[in-house]
Amino acid sequence: MQSNLGTLLVNSPIEQRKAEHLKLCLQGDVNHQEITTGFEKYRFRHCALPELDFAEIDLRVEFLGWRLAAPLLISSMTGGTPQAGEINRRLARVAQQKGIVMGVGSQRVLLEHPEVATTFAIRREAPTIPLLANLGAVQLNYGCGVSECQKIVDLLEANALILHLNPLQEAVQTGGDRNFKGLLTKIGVLCRALPVPVIVKEVGNGISAEVAKQLVDVGVAAIDVAGAGGTSWAKVEAARAQDASQRYLGDAFAEWGIPTAHCLEQVHTALPDTPLIASGGLKDGIDVAKALALGAGLAGLARPFLQAAHQSEEALAQRIDLLLEELKTVLFCTGSATPQALYQRRCLERI
């Protein structure tokens, strides 16, 4: 069974692409260099007398009705290959242990190669936490309808479906799917038809307030701004490209996008009641705290957790523990007893 799967993965273009994406995200120099997340432009106002017991700081939050031990999401990144399957299982076990949310990488491959379903089959590893299914929104224009979306939700036993918007990646990717016409209407149909919430995210170029409002108006339950400042998928596709002109195209757009902090601030101002996820270049608990103070309900990290999980399950657990300790320290040193208090106390200042 395993050898047959390996042969399929080698011979399948979509699986070859998945393997290349995973390798580059683990080992490649694919981060934005010139554009930053924008979080460095903010600083917390220190509270010398917090009037708190550090041991009593409570990181628990609710998001979309889910009760979580901390406001943290292991963001969508991988799936569809044996290596990705093992990484997903490690991510799921640690997410379950920590009581946080986990998203998987795009499940489009399941619709073309159902035999790779085991690489996404992680509910056994994570029986009680929210799991997020994932599909490129553009696939709604390439044969994926409500039934296909329901199928990938069911296969993961997911609590929500993420639709990712990646126009730049598709534009610079060799053979990318570039027809984004009419997607908003189809997203609305999907939101009304599925029994689970639909979350829409970018992949590292950001969602503007205008686009976020359009999405919420058709029924999207939450927005993951997924801004610029972390992984540049234009760089990833440039590194993969075999054709020189395609490589140049990817490199030309390597620094394209809206910084994560700017997205978050603008979207929250326009849609103060919409649940928001902040992802895109967050690196530590201080960035997570800044995202929460700017209005996010959850903070998502992908590449840092992916790299730790590739090393070992223990390395991943330690990475998350450190991040949560950093977050607690920010709460303590701002006099905030809970993550919600970071926002309520208005203790983040632009510098």
Swiss-Prot record:
Keyword Nucleus included in the entry's annotation: no
InterPro entries with a match to the protein in the record: Aldolase_TIM (IPR013785), FMN-dep_DH (IPR000262), IPdP_isomerase (IPR011179)
Residues at which FMN binds: 75-78, 106, 134, 201, 231, 281-283, 302-303
GO molecular function, one term: magnesium ion binding
GO biological process assignments: isoprenoid biosynthetic process
Subunit details: Homooctamer. Dimer of tetramers.
Protein name: Isopentenyl-diphosphate delta-isomerase
Source species taxonomy: Bacteria, Bacillati, Cyanobacteriota, Cyanophyceae, Acaryochloridales
Gene that this sequence comes from: fni
